[in-house]
Amino acid sequence: MSEESCLFCKIIAGEISGEFVHQDDHCVVIRDVNPQAPMHMLVIPRQHLESLDDASQKEEGLLGHLLRIGARIANLQDHDSYRTVINTGSGAGQSVFHLHVHVLAGRGMSWPPG
């Protein structure tokens, strides 16, 4: 998928409306449109990477930042228990091919996830 046709790139660029729960120089956070928990946020890097497989060593700092922002957002929503998920590839449930971290909270979660 090219950046020009990427849903998340269009949201980040303001071409498609989206309410940012958080934004900084490296990422934005939006609510998932199909939530799987009472709190379900997506932490999306501004840099277009199709999946975790496309991240190189130079993106290690960015990946850490995405996880820290996810934790901060969960804590600001008064959740001290939450799950972070990165789906990589369609077989793992990735439906938008722009790397993003799901942050889910507000209900009990079991293991394995499914």
Task: Please identify what each model-predicted range represents.
Residues 1-114:
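HIT superfamily nucleotide-processing domains
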